[in-house]
Amino acid sequence: MLTWLTRDSLTFPPLEKALHDPNGLLAAGGDLSPERLVQAYRHGCFPWYQDGQPILWWSPDPRTVLLPDQLHVSRSLAKLMRQGRYQVSFDTDFPAVIAACAAPRDYADGTWITDTMRNAYCELHRRGIAHSVEVRQDGKLVGGLYGLAMGQLFFGESMFSRADNASKVGFVTLVNHLRDAGFALIDCQMPTNHLHSLGAHAISRAEFADYLAHHLDQPNSATWVA
C-alpha cells in the first residue's frame, strides 16, 4: 500500500515498504522543500514525477551506482579529453545546467524536471548542497550535469549533451574530482547504457542503504569553485 506524505511531517516510510510494481515507488505527496529533499536523499529516495502528477518518491531495487575507483574511460574518450576540445567547470552556472537538463528531448515526451523542481534544486544549490558541472566549447555551454553532495556520497540527478560526448567528459571530470576528495559512491539512480559504459553497475537496495549508513556523515575534501 502506497504511503501518502503530509506537509507537516518529513518522515518517509522504511525503504522495504517500496512497491515492486512499479519498482521502487515508496511514497507520494508532500512537497519539495529543501528540508524534505535533504531528508529524502539521506533516507535513500528521490523525487521523480511528471508535471500534473503528485510528487512521487522512489527507491528502486536494484540501484545503479558508480564507485569512483571503478570508472571506465574508453580510449576514444580519453583521447578526446586530452585534446582539450571542451572546458569543464563546477558551479559556474547551475541554473543554466538544470534548465538544459529540463529541456525537451527528441526521445522523450515532456520532462520530469518541472519548474517547481528546478526552483527547489536551485535553492539547494544556494545552500551549498546541490552542485553543477558545466562543459563548454568556445565559451558555449554544450553539456553538463547536476546532483547533490552529502558526506562522501554524490547523488546524480540529470545530465545533458549538445555536442559529441560532452556529458561524458563532464561526468568523468566530476568522478575524478570526487575520487580525489574521498567520495565513496556516485548514485546514478536508474540504469542507462550511457552510464554502464562508464563503469556504473547495479547493487541491491540493502547494499545502497549500507553506503548511506557508513558514508553520509563522513567528511570529504571537495571544493566547488564558482
UniProtKB/Swiss-Prot annotation:
- Compartmental location: Cytoplasm
Q: Which reaction does it catalyse?
A: N-terminal L-lysyl-[protein] + L-leucyl-tRNA(Leu) = N-terminal L-leucyl-L-lysyl-[protein] + tRNA(Leu) + H(+); N-terminal L-arginyl-[protein] + L-leucyl-tRNA(Leu) = N-terminal L-leucyl-L-arginyl-[protein] + tRNA(Leu) + H(+); L-phenylalanyl-tRNA(Phe) + an N-terminal L-alpha-aminoacyl-[protein] = an N-terminal L-phenylalanyl-L-alpha-aminoacyl-[protein] + tRNA(Phe)
Under which EC number(s) is this enzyme classified? 2.3.2.6
- Name a single GO cellular component: cytoplasm
Instruction: Please provide the record's keywords in A-Z order.
Output: Acyltransferase, Cytoplasm, Transferase
| Transferase keyword on record | yes
Q: What class of enzyme is it?
A: transferase
Say which domain of life the source belongs to.
Bacteria
Gene Ontology BP terms: protein catabolic process
InterPro entries, alphabetized: Acyl_CoA_acyltransferase, Leu/Phe-tRNA_Trfase, Leu/Phe-tRNA_Trfase_C, Leu/Phe-tRNA_Trfase_N
Q: List the disulfide bonds.
A: none
- GO molecular function terms noted in the UniProt entry: leucyl-tRNA--protein transferase activity
| Protein family according to the UniProt entry | Belongs to the L/F-transferase family.
As for what it does, the entry says: Functions in the N-end rule pathway of protein degradation where it conjugates Leu, Phe and, less efficiently, Met from aminoacyl-tRNAs to the N-termini of proteins containing an N-terminal arginine or lysine.
The molecule here is called Leucyl/phenylalanyl-tRNA--protein transferase
Q: Which organism is it from?
A: Pseudomonas putida (strain GB-1)
- What is the primary gene name for this protein? aat
